[in-house]
Structures are given as structure tokens and as C-alpha cells.
């Protein structure tokens, strides 16, 4: 099951857990109130998984690819890692399914505090359009993930501040319960 927690304020190595002290765990229900969706799947059978196919069909995730993030396989690795960790939003959902390895998605809560979501093999997450977030590897420096999209793949990050985009306006309304 996924683990999530409020982060400390440290700017040290982002690959470390950065748990607030005292520890402030975050459950799936709290993540759902932010629009974050989570599934635990069997990553060993991702190529022929009826549960994954049902999720894709229900949510219209019609396109996918696989990305491996590690120094040996990702061109411009250092540049990409910095870009992924820059706080940003997207105009569409961001959907990731961890097939191997691990990393962290950080998302902002309703009070603009960071929540760290630990992602490991078998974890699938959907971040809503308009949520400020970032991604980093953990100390293992390796993740292989399936990226899913509705229609043609679009992965355009808009670094904060990006409050003027309709996706952000709609997300804030969702948080306020008025969407």
C-alpha cells in the first residue's frame, strides 16, 4: 500500500524521505480530497493485466509508453531530473505506473504544504490537471514507469506560478468544493 507523509522544510538531497518531525502520515482518503487517485497493481503482468485494461478503458487512457529514469538510459539525465523536480502543473492528468524501482511524487495540499508520496513497483497514480507537483527518484536512482495519456501524449510542464491556466482555476474550484 502506498505511503505518504508531510515533508520537512529541508532543502537537502531531494532523494531522501524528508519526513516532517513528528511524523505526519497522509492516507489515501486525504489524497483523494486533493484529486489524487491510486491503484495497487501487479507490475509483473502489466502487459496482460485485465485490471489495468479496465482502468485504461474506464478513464480513457488510450496511449502509453514506458520511460526508464537512470543515468545509464536517460539522455540529459541531470537536466531532466532537475526539470522533473521543479514545481509545476499540467493542463491534463499525469498518470504513472511504476513497473520497477521507486521514486517520490510531491503534491501540494490545500494549505500549500508538501505531501510526499512514495511510489514503488506496482503503484499507479493519477495526479489531476492543475495540481502543483514534482517528481524525484529516491536513493536507488532508478525507476521504470508506464506513462499513460488520454489521446495523444502531451507532457508540457508549466512551472509555478501558473495560476492563470484554466486547469489550475478549475482545480482550485475543485479544492473549494465548487467545481
Swiss-Prot record:
Q: What is this protein called?
A: Acireductone dioxygenase
Q: What does this protein do?
A: Catalyzes 2 different reactions between oxygen and the acireductone 1,2-dihydroxy-3-keto-5-methylthiopentene (DHK-MTPene) depending upon the metal bound in the active site. Fe-containing acireductone dioxygenase (Fe-ARD) produces formate and 2-keto-4-methylthiobutyrate (KMTB), the alpha-ketoacid precursor of methionine in the methionine recycle pathway. Ni-containing acireductone dioxygenase (Ni-ARD) produces methylthiopropionate, carbon monoxide and formate, and does not lie on the methionine recycle pathway. Also down-regulates cell migration mediated by MMP14.
- Its main subcellular localisation, reduced to a broad class, is cytoplasm
Asked if Metal-binding is a keyword of the record, the answer is yes
Source superkingdom = Eukaryota
The gene from which this protein is expressed is Adi1
Q: Return one Gene Ontology term, BP aspect.
A: L-methionine salvage from methylthioadenosine
Which reactions appear under catalytic activity for this entry?
A: 1,2-dihydroxy-5-(methylsulfanyl)pent-1-en-3-one + O2 = 4-methylsulfanyl-2-oxobutanoate + formate + 2 H(+); 1,2-dihydroxy-5-(methylsulfanyl)pent-1-en-3-one + O2 = 3-(methylsulfanyl)propanoate + CO + formate + 2 H(+)
Amino acid at each position: 500500500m502506498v505511503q505518504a507523509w508531510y515533508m520537512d522544510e529541508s532543502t537537502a538531497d531531494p532523494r531522501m524521505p524528508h519526513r516532517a518531525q513528528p511524523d505526519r502520515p497522509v492516507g489515501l482518503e486525504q489524497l483523494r480530497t486533493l484529486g489524487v487517485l491510486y491503484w495497487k497493481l501487479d507490475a509483473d503482468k502489466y502487459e496482460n493485466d485485465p485490471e489495468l485494461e479496465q482502468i485504461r478503458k474506464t478513464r480513457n487512457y488510450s496511449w502509453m509508453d514506458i520511460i526508464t529514469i537512470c543515468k545509464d538510459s536517460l539522455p540529459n539525465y541531470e537536466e531532466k531530473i532537475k526539470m522533473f523536480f521543479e514545481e509545476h502543473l499540467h493542463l491534463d492528468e499525469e498518470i504513472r505506473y511504476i513497473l520497477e524501482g521507486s521514486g517520490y511524487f510531491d503534491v501540494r495540499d490545500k494549505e500549500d504544504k508538501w505531501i510526499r508520496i512514495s511510489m514503488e513497483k506496482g503503484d499507479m497514480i493519477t495526479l489531476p490537471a492543475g495540481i502543483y507537483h514534482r517528481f524525484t527518484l529516491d536513493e536507488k536512482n532508478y525507476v521504470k514507469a508506464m506513462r499513460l495519456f488520454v489521446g495523444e501524449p502531451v507532457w508540457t510542464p508549466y512551472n509555478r506560478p501558473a495560476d492563470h491556466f484554466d486547469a489550475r482555476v478549475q482545480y482550485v474550484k475543485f479544492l473549494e468544493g465548487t467545481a
